[in-house]
């Protein structure tokens, strides 16, 4: 193969990869704008986390609570009323100033705040035995690996005997159900089940079934960084955090009128669609370049 042809191949591939990266970066900018849009529409101003992070301080500092004490300024030393911890959690981080500021920011929303439980029901998954798994059927078991941020992926499927769908009606996953991971590395991540395939829910996952909320709005809200932090705050466990359905339903969220929820959901959906188009364009650009290179090689 001539040197000129080799160089041309290199240029085509490099150009395609560059265009793909540009498309992906543009798509990511769109996706990153969703959180700011949602927070802005709700009137939530985020506290600056660095202002409340524990810092190393001089060992000679006094432990009084005056405002000029560095421990107080950095949120490492604070007071909590006994009534707030009696019969409740006593881990200090739960009552940290940063978490209190997050809650205050949410309560300062343009809209009233209510617990998720006032508008949604919750169903925990069932502990199906791995001995019941089979190679193929029309009954899918949704496990924690299927629940990602904003999406329920069915690329890897686990199957149960078909009759289980009728045997365990309580644990059926319905189309447009909001699913949440309740343990492990993806704890707190929520996604909407957009399939009509028959599915049951495995243990340590939950269904948040909305009564009169826009599910897409709720999904994007719970996937906000501040809500992911609140979910972790309400979790328990050492090496592996776990959260219960009861704790999830206690979380307060802004409740705009349904029309406003629908408006925000539509806008966010449009942003995601544009981002998906850009991602697909990037893939197609690279694929066309590969085909062009293949033709050049075969032609020589």
Name each region found by the language model.
Residues 143-144, 165-171, 175-223:
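A short beta-sheet element
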Residues 7-8, 150-152, 189-190, 216-217:
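Short helix/loop capping segments that flank catalytic or ligand/cofactor-binding pockets
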Residues 113-132, 145-175:
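Sequence-specific dsDNA recognition surfaces
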Residues 2-127, 250, 254-300:
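Non-catalytic DNA-recognition/assembly elements of restriction-modification systems
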Residues 48-53, 129-137, 156, 233-235:
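Short coil/turn segments at secondary-structure boundaries
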Residues 192, 234-237:
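Short amphipathic beta-strand starts and helix->beta connectors
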Residues 148, 185, 257:
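Flexible, active-site-proximal loop/turn residues at the rims of small-molecule/cofactor binding pockets
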Residues 1-4, 198-206, 213-216, 236-262:
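A short glycine-rich beta-alpha junction/loop motif
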């Amino acid at each position: 193969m001539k040197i000129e042809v080799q160089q041309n191949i290199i240029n085509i591939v490099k150009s395609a990869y560059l265009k793909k990266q540009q498309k992906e970066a543009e798509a990511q900018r769109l996706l990153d704008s969703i959180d700011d849009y949602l927070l802005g529409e709700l009137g939530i101003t985020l506290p600056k986390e660095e202002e409340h992070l524990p810092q190393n301080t001089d060992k000679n500092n006094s432990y009084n609570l005056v405002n000029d004490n560095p421990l107080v300024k950095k949120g490492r030393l604070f007071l909590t009323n006994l009534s707030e911890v009696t019969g409740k959690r006593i881990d200090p981080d739960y009552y940290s100033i940063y978490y209190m500021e997050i809650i205050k920011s949410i309560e300062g929303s343009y809209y009233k705040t209510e617990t998720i439980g006032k508008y949604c029901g919750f169903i925990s998954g069932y502990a199906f035995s791995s001995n019941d798994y089979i190679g193929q059927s029309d009954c899918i078991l949704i496990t924690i690996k299927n629940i990602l941020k904003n999406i329920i992926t069915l690329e890897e499927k686990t199957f149960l005997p078909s009759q289980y769908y009728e045997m365990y009606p309580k644990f059926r996953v319905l189309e447009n159900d909001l699913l949440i991971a309740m343990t492990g590395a993806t704890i707190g991540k929520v996604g909407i089940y957009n399939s009509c395939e028959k599915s049951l829910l495995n243990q340590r996952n939950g269904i948040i079934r909305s009564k009169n909320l826009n599910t897409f709005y709720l999904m994007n809200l719970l996937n906000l960084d501040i809500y992911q932090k609140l979910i972790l705050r309400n979790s328990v466990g050492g090496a592996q955090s776990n959260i219960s359905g009861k704790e999830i339903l206690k979380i307060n969220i802004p409740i705009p009128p349904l029309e406003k929820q629908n408006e925000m959901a539509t806008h966010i959906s449009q942003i995601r669609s544009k981002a998906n188009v850009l991602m697909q364009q990037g893939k197609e650009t690279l694929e066309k370049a590969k085909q062009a290179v293949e033709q050049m090689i075969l032609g020589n």
